[in-house]
């Protein structure tokens, strides 16, 4: 089709729209209500799109204008509702907003501005296939259309602009034919826009409605080649005014949307951070709870072990029985019954007789047979008691039987109680009929006291044996029954511990010991008669009361064994005596003993022994120390005071306050010092009296008799006629002949039956052979010798347990073997180390502790004599580590065959009866081995040094130089080198030779340290084979160094040389490593 076709197309389109253009006011009125022209415009555009294939490029131009008009009208709806290409459309919209904000301002300033076409707005994307390409085209159209209005401002008319646009068809992109679905979609979108505009018109003013209708008509007129410039300008102005608010609202919505998304993103990030923090806190809290749970579990385990060690651990069955007994006791107390065992330990009360006779008189046989209850004389309580106690009759059958057996023997005493009770009951009933229950209970207590007093005066035939039967099962402590306190003597070697005991018991044990040094634990029991006789000198006025049955004193060889006994958890020692030599003051083992006593919180007194060593001291045998001191000369008293103050100062340095016992006003804060002399016995009565006073007054709770058994094995000995026996310390409880006992053995737990219980004669040492006293049962505290089967392999120092009726032997066996397992845990698992053999567990632990401090591994341990099998086991070290092929044997016999085998195999056996001698012998052997190692490694071990040449006396074969030691130590046989830097930066090492001899001040020396030689040292070097001329290859200005290597550094780390290398020398080695390039 040619121009004619094109014109006819335009004519038809203008005819269709002519009425609207001519009657614009009428159209605006109609569009305020409805806009049917949009539907007609859509139909026209569809027909035009079908016929556009046959038109020229100019006609395509007209179709494009029409399409742009439709797209412009639907811009906002597509931005909000169409999900395709949000990012590209957003960018285009922002560009459009800037243009629309700019163009209306120009329209207001120019009175006759050119018509701005709707094509100035960017084209919307018509299909999702090419969003990027369409965006680019849109941006290109924007640039072109932004340029054309500027030309219109220079005087050109709107119609000429339209014609110029029509005359440039190549610049307009070709528009494709829309499908039916696309047309329907556009139609729907226009319908949505129309409804949206209607809603906006209802809210706006009449002027805004007019502007909105003008916009619609202007959009239609823009696509039509209008001829009236004034109408076109009016439409353009209306369109510009309408577009501004809509685009601003859209931009505002987009900003709100963007702000909302950013806020949501921030909230999500904050929630994620909070969640992560909560998770971390939860993990921390969980870890804390887990740690607390583990600590609690460990605490419960330790508490359980401690209770087991003390014999206080109860099985489930025992706990149930105890709870049942407690409930029954509570029921009795609530019913008004009073238990004798809980009456503050009033031993004088005899409630068993009162209850029995009163209940017989009132017809209540159940109370009379119970033997442990005391009821009120009040009638109301007597009536209630049968109902309460009838429930317990079946549980008290045994006690009833025992009491009935004694009724005949107690008839006379019962009659006395009957008369006394009848006399007291009549006024009681008459006076207290209206008294409250509290008054009755008070009267019951007062009656019981009166009854006890009368019973003591009138009835002296009462049997004391009934008292233990009256004690309830719940109470295992009798407050009026104190056992013998256990006292331990500690102190440094040769301070006079055993000699002090010899003075107490009038014995001479110390002289019979090997080297005069105690090697084993010994126990001596002092009966109260002996104590009274000993303290008679200081108790002339009779102020000191004796409430304990005796005193058990344990003599220890040192802190090691005492630690071993304390580690078992037994309360073996109640009070301790720390012996200090007044001439020497505090010594190393004394300080160790103080630390041990402080850790165990054991109270102690200090015996300042050997006061008779003071020059000029006049001894008075077995005298009180205050009396003896007052009879000495003034000079001796001054020296005594000086030495005491010096020891007090040393104790203060250890954190202890101390004072002489007769000047001590605060026993709780100050340690008492008792001057003594083991030779003359002076001060010994003061010491014993102080021990008795402290234990009775300040420690009565700790020495109460407890039925729970606590027993520790001290020694294992073979006695002629008795066989293998064990010496034990019975701290608490009772041992009976025939008891089933469990103790620790080298081959496993030992379960046997007691055949005999023996004790030494009073004031006799348990270690000394003497006649023994046989016992059917022994009460704590006492040193006891037990005869039983299978005791040969018993471990000295371990606990002893008695199998009760409700105990399981296997459980006790596992518990008792824990002591040995803890000891075996110290053995080196690598299998390389020395073999240790000892007589007791305590001495074995002392040896192991010493070897641990010396950092010497232990491969095997054993208790008892040394046999061939022990030597064979030790001989395996000859292949692994020859220096550890030795045995340390303390206080044990070595079999003759074992000695011969050890000599053949090359195993060294160290045996000693004094543990300190064994330490010395082993230390000397170690030094000898180290010296051999040093000699063997002397060529390899090179000590670091830096030398400065002072003078050259001989420059070749041999080189003799005068040098000064700048750093380190110069020794004989040290290789000396000079180091020069090559042009490439690498060090060049020039060997001069080894040091053959050293002279300082014309005297030969083996080594010279830094700063030791003021005028220098003459050093002779033996040539290493290379012909070096001092002065040619090496000059006096060159520094000289000892030639160290990686092998020499490793040899210095060996124990043979490690102690000889100082910290400064190690720093010098680090510097020389960099110089010689050693890695």
UniProtKB/Swiss-Prot annotation:
Subcellular location per the Swiss-Prot or TrEMBL entry: Cytoplasm
Molecular function terms from GO: GTP binding; GTPase activity; metal ion binding; translation initiation factor activity
EC number(s) given by UniProt: 3.6.5.3
Phosphothreonine carried by residues: 364
Superkingdom, natural source: Eukaryota
Pfam families: GTP_EFTU, GTP_EFTU_D4, IF-2
GO biological process, one term: cytoplasmic translational initiation
Bias type Basic and acidic residues, positions: 173-192, 253-293, 385-408, 436-466
SUPFAM superfamilies, alphabetized: Initiation factor IF2/eIF5b, domain 3, P-loop containing nucleoside triphosphate hydrolases, Translation proteins
Cofactor(s) named in the record: a monovalent cation
Region of interest: G1: 491-498
Record region (G3): 555-558
Compositionally biased residues, Basic residues: 57-67, 105-114, 193-204
Catalytic reaction list: GTP + H2O = GDP + phosphate + H(+)
Cofactor note: Binds 1 monovalent cation per monomer in the active site. Structural cofactor that stabilizes the GTP-bound 'on' state. May also act as a transition state stabilizer of the hydrolysis reaction.
Region span, G4: 609-612
Region (G2): 516-520
Function: Plays a role in translation initiation. Translational GTPase that catalyzes the joining of the 40S and 60S subunits to form the 80S initiation complex with the initiator methionine-tRNA in the P-site base paired to the start codon. GTP binding and hydrolysis induces conformational changes in the enzyme that renders it active for productive interactions with the ribosome. The release of the enzyme after formation of the initiation complex is a prerequisite to form elongation-competent ribosomes.
Protein name, per record: Eukaryotic translation initiation factor 5B
Organism: Schizosaccharomyces pombe (strain 972 / ATCC 24843) (Fission yeast)
């Amino acid at each position: 089709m040619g121009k004619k076709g094109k014109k006819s197309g335009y004519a038809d389109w203008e005819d269709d729209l002519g009425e609207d253009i001519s009657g614009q006011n009428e159209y605006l009125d109609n569009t305020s209500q409805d806009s049917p022209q949009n539907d007609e415009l859509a139909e026209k555009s569809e027909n035009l799109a079908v016929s556009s294939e046959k038109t020229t490029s100019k006609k395509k131009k007209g179709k494009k204008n029409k399409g742009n008009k439709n797209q412009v009208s639907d811009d906002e709806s597509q931005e909000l509702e169409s999900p395709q290409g949000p990012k590209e459309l957003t960018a285009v919209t922002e560009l459009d907003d800037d243009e629309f904000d700019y163009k209306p301002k120009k329209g207001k300033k120019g009175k006759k501005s050119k018509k701005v076409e709707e094509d100035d707005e960017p084209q919307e994307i018509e299909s999702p296939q090419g969003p990027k390409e369409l965006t680019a085209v849109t941006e290109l159209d924007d640039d072109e259309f932004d340029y054309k209005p500027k030309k219109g401002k220079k005087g050109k008319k709107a119609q000429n602009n339209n014609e110029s646009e029509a005359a440039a068809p190549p610049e307009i992109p070709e528009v494709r034919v829309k499908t039916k679905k696309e047309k329907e979609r556009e139609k729907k979108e226009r319908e949505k826009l129309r409804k949206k505009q209607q809603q906006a018109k209802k809210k706006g003013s009449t002027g805004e409605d007019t502007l909105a209708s003008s916009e619609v008509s202007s959009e239609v007129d823009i696509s039509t080649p209008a001829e009236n410039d004034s109408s076109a300008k009016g439409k353009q102005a209306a369109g510009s005014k309408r577009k501004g608010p809509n685009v601003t609202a859209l931009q505002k919505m987009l900003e709100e949307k963007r702000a909302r998304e950013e806020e949501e993103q921030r909230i999500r990030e904050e929630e994620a951070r909070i969640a992560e923090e909560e998770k971390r806190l939860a993990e921390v809290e969980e870890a804390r709870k887990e740690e607390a749970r583990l600590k609690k579990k460990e605490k419960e385990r330790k508490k359980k072990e401690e209770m087991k060690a003390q014999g206080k651990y109860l099985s489930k069955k025992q706990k149930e029985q105890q709870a049942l007994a407690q409930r029954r006791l509570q029921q009795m107390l609530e019913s008004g019954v009073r238990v004798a065992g809980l009456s503050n330990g009033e031993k004088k009360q005899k409630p068993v007789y009162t209850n029995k006779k009163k209940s017989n008189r009132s017809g209540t046989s159940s109370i009379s047979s119970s033997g442990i209850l005391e009821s009120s004389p009040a009638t109301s309580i007597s009536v209630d008691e049968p109902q309460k106690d009838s429930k317990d009759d079946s549980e008290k059958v045994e006690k009833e039987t025992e009491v009935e057996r004694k009724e005949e023997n107690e008839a006379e005493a019962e009659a006395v109680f009957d008369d006394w009770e009848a006399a007291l009951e009549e006024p009681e009933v008459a006076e207290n009929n209206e008294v409250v229950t509290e008054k009755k209970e008070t009267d019951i207590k007062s009656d019981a006291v009166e009854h006890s007093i009368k019973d003591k005066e009138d009835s002296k035939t009462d049997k004391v044996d009934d008292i233990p039967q009256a004690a309830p099962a719940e109470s295992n402590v009798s407050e009026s029954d104190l056992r013998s306190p256990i006292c331990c003597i500690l102190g440094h070697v040769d301070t006079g511990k055993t000699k002090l005991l010899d003075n107490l018991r009038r014995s001479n044990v110390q002289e019979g010991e090997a080297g005069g040094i105690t090697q084993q634990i010994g126990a001596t029991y002092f009966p109260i008669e002996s104590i009274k006789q000993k303290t008679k000198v200081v108790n002339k006025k009779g102020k000191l009361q004796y409430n304990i049955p005796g005193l058990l004193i344990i003599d220890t060889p040192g802190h090691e064994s005492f630690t071993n006994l304390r580690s078992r958890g037994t309360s073996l020692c109640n009070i301790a005596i720390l012996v200090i030599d007044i001439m020497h003051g505090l010594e190393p083992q004394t300080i160790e003993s103080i630390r041990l006593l402080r850790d165990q919180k054991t109270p102690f007194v200090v015996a300042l022994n050997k006061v008779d060593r003071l020059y000029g001291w006049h001894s008075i045998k077995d005298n009180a120390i205050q009396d003896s001191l007052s009879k000495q000369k003034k000079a001796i008293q001054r020296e005594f005071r000086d030495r005491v103050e010096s020891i007090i100062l040393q104790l203060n340095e250890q954190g202890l306050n101390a004072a002489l016992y007769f000047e001590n006003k605060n026993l709780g804060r100050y340690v008492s010092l008792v001057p003594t002399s083991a030779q003359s016995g002076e001060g010994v009565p003061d010491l014993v009296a102080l021990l008795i006073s402290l234990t009775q007054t300040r420690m009565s709770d700790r020495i109460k008799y407890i039925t729970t058994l606590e027993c520790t094995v001290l020694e294992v000995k073979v006695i002629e006629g008795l066989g293998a026996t064990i010496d034990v310390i019975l701290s608490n409880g009772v041992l009976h002949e025939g008891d089933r006992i469990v103790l620790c053995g080298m081959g496993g737990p030992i379960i046997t039956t007691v055949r005999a219980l023996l004790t030494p004669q009073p004031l006799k040492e348990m270690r000394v052979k003497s006649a023994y006293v046989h016992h059917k049962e022994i009460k704590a505290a006492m040193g006891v010798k037990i005869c039983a089967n299978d005791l040969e392999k018993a471990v000295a120092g371990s606990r002893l347990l008695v199998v009760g009726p409700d105990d399981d032997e296997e459980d006790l066996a596992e518990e008792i073997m824990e002591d040995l397992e803890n000891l075996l845990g110290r053995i080196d698992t690598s299998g390389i180390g020395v073999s240790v053999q000892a007589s007791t567990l305590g001495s074995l632990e002392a040896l192991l502790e010493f070897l641990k401090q010396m950092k010497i591994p232990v491969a095997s341990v054993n208790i008892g004599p040394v046999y061939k099998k022990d030597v064979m086991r030790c001989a395996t070290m000859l292949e692994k580590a020859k220096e550890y092929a030795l045995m340390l044997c303390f206080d044990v016999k070595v079999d003759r065959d074992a000695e011969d085998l050890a000599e053949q195999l090359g195993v060294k056996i160290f045996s000693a009866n004094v543990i300190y001698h064994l330490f010395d012998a082993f230390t000397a052997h170690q030094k000898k081995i180290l010296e051999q190692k040093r000699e063997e490694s002397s060529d390899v071990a090179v000590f670091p040094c830096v030398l400065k040449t002072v003078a050259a006396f001989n420059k070749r074969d041999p080189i003799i130089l005068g040098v000064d030691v700048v750093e380190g130590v110069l020794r004989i046989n040290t290789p000396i080198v000079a180091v020069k830097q090559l042009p490439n930066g690498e060090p060049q090492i020039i060997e001069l030779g080894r040091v053959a001899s050293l002279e300082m001040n014309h005297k030969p020396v083996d080594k010279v340290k830094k700063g030791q030689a003021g005028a220098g040292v003459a050093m002779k070097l033996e040539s290493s084979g290379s012909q070096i001329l001092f002065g040619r290859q090496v000059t006096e200005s060159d520094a000289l160094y000892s030639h160290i290597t990686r092998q020499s550094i490793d040899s210095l780390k060996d124990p043979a040389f490690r102690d000889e290398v100082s910290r400064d020398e190690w720093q010098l080695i680090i510097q020389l490593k960099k110089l010689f390039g050693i890695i």
